[in-house]
Amino acid sequence: MSNEDVAEDVSQVTDFHFHTCRKFRLFSSKSDGYSQNEINIRNRVATSSQLGVTFVTVNSNQLSCFHTKSLLGYKITRENMNVEVTDLPIKTIRLHGVVLINDMGVNSDGTVLGVLHTKNNDVSVDVFDIKKICTSSSIEPFKPLCTTRVGTEQINQGSCLEWNPAFPDTFAASSTDRSILVAKINVQSPANQKLVGIGKFGAVTTAISWSPKGKQLTIGDSLGKIVQLKPELEVVRSQHGPENKPNYGRITGLCWLATTEWLVSLENGTDQDAYLMRCKKDKPTEWIQFHELSYSSSKWPLPPQLFPATQLLVDWNVVIVGNSKTSEISTVGKRDDWQTWVPVEGESIYLPTTSSGKDTVPIGVAVDRSMTDEVLLNPDGSQRHRPSPLVLCLTNDGILTAHHIISTFAAHIPCQMSSQNLAINDLKKLQFDSQKPISAPPSDQTPVTKPSTVFGQKPEAETLKSSLVGSPSSVQTPKPSSSLFNPKSIASNIETSQLTESKPSTPAAPSSQPKIASTPKSEAIPKISDKTLEHKKAELIATKKQVLIERMDKINDSMAGAKDATMKLSFAVGKVKTTIMECADVVRASLGDSKEVMDELKNLILSIERMSDRTQHTVKEMDFEIDEKMELVAGVEDGNQVLEKLRNMSETEKLMRFNKLETAADLLNGKYEECSDLIKKLRMSLSEKESLRKQAILSPLRLSSNLNQLRSGSETELALKVMRNVSKIIMDTREQIQRTELEFVRFQRDVKFQNFKKGKENLNFTQPLEMSSLDGDAPQGKSLTDAESIKVRQALVNQIQKRGIVKTRNVIVESYKKSENSAAMKNDLLDTSNLSNAILKLSMTPRRVMPSSSLFSASPSTPSTKSDAATQADEPPIVKTVVVTVESPAKPIASAPAVSSPLIKLNTTTATTTMTTPKVTVPKEEANKTQDQKPIISTPASSSIFSSGSLFGTKTQTPLVSKEESTLTTGVPSLINSSLSISPQEIEKASSKVETLNKTEEVKDEKSENEVTPDLKSEEPKSLETKVKEEPKPAVQTPVKEEETGSNIQKTPSFSFNSTTTPKSTSSTSSIFGGGLKTQTPSSSNSTNIFGARTTTTATPTPASNTSSIFGGGSKAASSPFGSFGQAGCQPAKTSNPATSTASVTFSFNTGATSASAKPAGFGSFGAGASAKPSSVFGGSVTAPTVPNVDDGMEDDSMANGGGSGGFMSGLGNARTSNTSGGNNPFAPKTSTGTSASSSSWLFGGGGNQQQQQQQKPSFSFNTAGSSAQQASAPATGTSSVFGGAPKFGSQPAFGAKPFGGGANAGLSKNASIFGGATSSTTNNPATGGFAQFASGQKTSSLFGGGATPQTNTSIFGGGANTTPAPTSSVFGGGASANANKPTSFTSWR
């Protein structure tokens, strides 16, 4: 065969061939064919290389064994190479209980023999010890070590058996009832068997093959499917036969070659086709046909079967394959790929023919590796080869052939093993010479043939019977047609042989008598005696008896055959039944599929109908449009001309016109962009001019900021909107203040006429009354003219400027958002609708420039004694509700705030509750001789605009002052915050009461240390007149005595629109809206603010300061009807460290926050003391987190690290304590990250807490001076915001974390927002400029949130913090990042 003729699956090899040895006859020729029982035997040859023993199935229930090496004892020559060896010594084995052998095999270590057999439809696997079989006597049947039953059906037969190639104690077996099992045996303890897996599949298993490593197994079934299984019979995957050949039947052979490759043969009619199946993961299965193995040339009625011998698979990648349809043994090997190897011509394995010249086919193949002698390649021994494996092939003619494998391939290393010299007892040589005299003496059987003709016997039966009589060896080899189920036939044959052998002369005598009597017929009759007749009768009876016995044997055989036929018929019926059931299932499945197809077709038809309807509708619409356009075209007279021109126009001209149009469009687009740029520039110029115009009424110090330029018109517009809103609020507030001042004068006059004064010791207000500090100054008449009103106002202004004390009035404001259930709410007492107008008018009123005041002053200053009188407007009074609240500085004090209910019920959209009136304790005024030498001590009292508690009914309790406090702070009255002026002598009594209460308080739990139940007592208020020093005198700073702690008292710098600053003085600074603060310096001076309020502040040991807001009172607020709306945070555990006290008044929509320790506060132009903790414009305070100096890009708007919560109008003031400094939510409370606290709050949220070593932060609040010393105490909870807190409508608010939020958390954008973000990770690189400064956490000062140190790089709404200004900074943003590439502006909103 040339190379061109070789297919891809065939490889011609020269280094691999076979050397043939002698051939041996093991049983007689099956010239009359095979019985069905013998056909069902799957493999008839098995060898044990470890023991050097080979087993051959010579009959359906009989085995023969012999030494494998004995095959090489017969030398081959040219003369005897075609001569059969008939005297091979073998041992005949009868197995106990075995009737029909189906399959057999030797395990991997060659110690046991497994036989799959069937007996009375019971299929079982018997495991025999090979050594016992060889060494025991053959007289008694051999008993197995253990027996394992396979299948449970009534009609069952063994199918196949396969030992695990890696684990010698494991085998798999199957039967025709679709059962399969995997068992594990124990040779030392045969009773201990283990069924690894047992199951029943959908088809009969016809082939089993283990993987080379023995980890898994593959089975092939009668439906042509290959299934990969685990030993527990768990299905790994399944594969059907080739898709292009759907008519294949059962699997006739299977061999697992490699991990993803199998040798598979499938039944194709009466033939079979062999394939290489390659199954790789995530790839289609490949099928490569082996044409050499698919070739069929046999005419024998044997079923198609493949016999793969895998003894060399692991070592050589070689499989010796026998095919029951061809007489050639093939080799499948792998070098580059799996192929069929074809050796040189004449060196392959060709099975011998029969005596009649008919080809034979293999019925068993095995490979033995126990040969240790060199192979003689020629008779003289001149050519030798190393010891090599021996291939054993058993033909259907009973011939066993042996062939040496001669391989010179370098990869084929020697794989021989030394076998044990196991002795086999009862070896006997075969004798097949008796076959020749069987046909020699037919004359001896002549008398026997006569009665046989009488009973219709055939000559063939006589020939068989003669062989039985003449040769005793025929008894040892039963007839092939003998019944399996009737052993009596064997016994009858034995009896017949014994009967004939006992009288050997009896057949000879009657045979001679007829010959003698046949010649002289006449003489022979009278000479016959009676004795002779009797002898003849006895002989005839014996002959008849023998014929009867033979007839009985035939009847037994026919009955056995009928029984077998019946069993086959039952099995066939079962198969037919199974097939019918399968067909029924297929029909059902087809019906189901048909229904599904019909449903799909119906759906498609419906879809097509819908589409047709839509198409018709579309066509109608198109027709309508076409009609309209045709009408339009018909109205054009020159339409045809235009169409003709368009048709006549060439493609080039069309393209040119299109290019011109495109160019014109591009030019137009460019012009549009230019116009857009010019419009932007124009807007920027307009915004700059607007900014310059507004700066005319602002403080000159604002002009010094280099951060007052905006980048774009959008930023300018947004910032102007914010400014207008803030200004509107300020104007409304100023207007209300003006009205309430005039109301105050008239109300004071009424108080005098009604003689409304009472004692000053214990004040308890049940009506909204106010103690006047301007007693006797108001006009006496009830009706005033315009001139008198102007005089009264001037006198009031002079008094206020001199004394610096202004009472807080209540302002009517409407809620910015009306309640949904306003009709159902009760106690509509308040309205905040005019607040925005008041603040706007207040901000737009020109203010007088203070000569020496510093907007960002951090040093002590001496304010001027003059203030702007523009706020005292001559307008009729509106509010008749006056609230006096006494607010705790930081630690609780003995006196509780007096809360009054309004006299009139105002129209409001927010329901409120009636407030109870806590006790206000005012000590009597006593003479103090040392008053001139000591600073004025006042009780700190700050009130919200409406009440000391929450706007919506939250009761407040003033905290107690610890016993370590040495001094108290006098009240800080203002137009917003009214307080009672108390002399130092009165404070001493208050202090004694406080100490008594504190002693009782210490016994309680720490959680309730800061709570006290006020003693409610109603008394009419008496007016108190505050003693004001006309001239400032030098005063020595009184140090605070400390017994337990040694914390230093920090001085609180002041900041206000006030008069000239005098260094080294005790300055009383007032903010625009009232109270100021006083710091201890070597000298003293007095100052009043624009509205005439003067305050004094002394260092008092306070753990934290309290803050009240418009919509929330001080600390320890009880729950209100509106939940946490306006609820203040709880006071933490008090500490003993002293701090500077501050009466803080916040103009905010958030409750006041209390903390465990305080920081020095900065100062804003609208509030003296600002929080060291920064706060957002609309939310809580912000702690600058440590984030990288880069922008992380777009982040999720949800709360990061749980630092803050909620969004705009979500939660409504729900305070939340967090371990992290949330900076995302501008409306949420900020948690304390250190041990200090502040009392500032933002416009819409309270101030938070700050770490002890952090720098001061800007604040945007309307509060008085509020500052306290640093204290190492437990961290305080953050404040809650009216418009912050927990999310009400989701965790990602519409106005949530980023747009108005504070400093971002770690990982978020560093320059996140104009109103938040712009945080700095280090104190040396703080954020600057814009609203971003409100949450930057730096020492900045701005118009709405001051700092302790004046900075140069500041803007109107946020100051710098000792940083170099960013090149791109604006009035409301920018310049917040040290990285110039990451500026902060309005465009940073996300």
Curated annotation (Swiss-Prot):
Biased composition (Gly residues) is annotated at 1201-1210
Basic and acidic residues: which segments have biased composition? 986-1033
Q: Sum up the protein's function in the record's words.
A: May serve as a docking site in the receptor-mediated import of substrates across the nuclear pore complex. Plays a role in apoptosis by tethering caspase ced-3 to the nuclear membrane preventing its autoprocessing in absence of ced-4.
Q: Which InterPro entries match?
A: Nucleoporin, Nup159/Nup146_N, WD40/YVTN_repeat-like_dom_sf
Give the highest taxon in the source lineage: Eukaryota
Task: Mark the sequence repeats by their residue spans.
Answer: 1073-1074, 1091-1092, 1111-1112, 1122-1123, 1125-1126, 1163-1164, 1166-1167, 1178-1179, 1244-1245, 1283-1284, 1289-1290, 1295-1296, 1300-1301, 1315-1316, 1344-1345, 1357-1358, 1372-1373
Membrane topology type: Peripheral membrane protein
Q: Which UniProt keywords apply?
A: Membrane, mRNA transport, Nuclear pore complex, Nucleus, Protein transport, Repeat, Translocation, Transport
Residue ranges annotated as compositionally biased, kind Polar residues, are 434-455, 464-521, 1078-1090, 1342-1371, 1378-1390
Q: Where in the cell is it found?
A: Nucleus, Nuclear pore complex; Nucleus membrane
Query: What's the short name of a Pfam family annotated to this entry?
Result: Beta-prop_NUP159_NUP214
Q: Does the record carry Repeat as a key word?
A: yes
Q: Which cysteines are joined by disulfide bonds?
A: none
- Say what happens when this gene is deleted: RNAi-mediated knockdown causes no visible phenotype. Simultaneous knockdown of npp-2 results in embryonic lethality. RNAi-mediated knockdown in a ced-1 (e1735) and ced-3 (n718) double mutant background partially restores embryonic cell apoptosis.
This one is known as: Nuclear pore complex protein 14
Ranges where the record places region 17 X 2 AA repeats of F-G: 1073-1373
- Report one GO cellular component: nuclear pore
Compositionally skewed regions (Low complexity) per UniProt: 851-864, 1051-1071, 1095-1109, 1231-1243, 1264-1280
- Tell me one GO biological process term: RNA export from nucleus
